[in-house]
């Protein structure tokens, strides 16, 4: 089988490539150049797009004895990930750029190019498993990345390979060291790669500009003015620009955002609790949409917990009733449905949250 391996320059994708070689496949490594402007992408850790990371990936490919290329996806990445991220925040949403990157870059644009060039599959260093075409959590639940892959269609998954999903992260590092890969001790990073400063508010402000509005409490009283709703997210407690806690002495949190009026609503932590979610553009990883309510577990953050729920498809949208309330759920987040079985937690599907009540 001809396999294209997406090599970020980190330890995970490096071991994934090595395992594909060991399995006897015809392997080619590729690194995606996601920016042409120096200093615009985070480097030195678990990067996926810097010159330093490309160099690390090339050195691993040399050790493995496989061809290696760098493909320029900068324009596509800007349009489908960065611009989407900015526009989503301007609408008062809270997107996950890693979800969007997997959906539109790695397993759409990159996978399509791979198939067009005659490759049979795209392998990555994601912590997830595929068994009988079913997407499942990784063995290492602490590193599991099935959440950010839950937007993939059955057709996209049919051409995907996740070689390290059955191995805990410490063992991956040990394996890399045994293989003599210099990235064995390379640090992980959980930051947004295209915000090198780590200051999301400043990044968004520079691109959206000042759009003044008000911060109001449950009575409608104006507590403060702000420079744009992009500086806030549901559940936020710090950096609200308000004088202090509420009249009862309890902290106040962002409970709602109205991008059209520029109004940021704040209230008590109990106001953050929701018991139902509405998801747009649902994707079912099996390729088959359920025709009846489904008992499942729901996760709304990449490294968040799950709660039991019932999900039902109605008029093209996913309606989810939670058995236990969740706090701080924001429009723009991805909701992922899981189902437990003897082979591990299976991903049923996902949707983008449009409302939480």
From Swiss-Prot:
Binding of ATP, residues: 6-13, 32, 125
A Gene Ontology molecular function term of the record: tRNA binding
Region (Interaction with tRNA): 143-145
Interaction with tRNA, annotated site positions: 126, 333
InterPro entries: MnmA-like, MnmA-like_C, MnmA-like_central, MnmA-like_central_sf, Rossmann-like_a/b/a_fold
Enzyme class: transferase
Catalytic residues (positions): 101 (nucleophile), 193 (cysteine persulfide intermediate)
GO cellular component: cytoplasm
Keyword terms: ATP-binding, Cytoplasm, Disulfide bond, Nucleotide-binding, RNA-binding, Transferase, tRNA processing, tRNA-binding
Catalyses which reaction(s): S-sulfanyl-L-cysteinyl-[protein] + uridine(34) in tRNA + AH2 + ATP = 2-thiouridine(34) in tRNA + L-cysteinyl-[protein] + A + AMP + diphosphate + H(+)
SUPFAM superfamilies reported in the protein's UniProt record: Adenine nucleotide alpha hydrolases-like (SSF52402)
Enzyme Commission number(s): 2.8.1.13
HAMAP family cross-referenced by the UniProt entry: tRNA_thiouridyl_MnmA
Family annotation (PANTHER family): MITOCHONDRIAL TRNA-SPECIFIC 2-THIOURIDYLASE 1, TRNA 5-METHYLAMINOMETHYL-2-THIOURIDYLATE -METHYLTRANSFERASE
Protein name: tRNA-specific 2-thiouridylase MnmA
Organism whose genome encodes this protein: Mycolicibacterium vanbaalenii (strain DSM 7251 / JCM 13017 / BCRC 16820 / KCTC 9966 / NRRL B-24157 / PYR-1) (Mycobacterium vanbaalenii)
UniProt gene name: mnmA
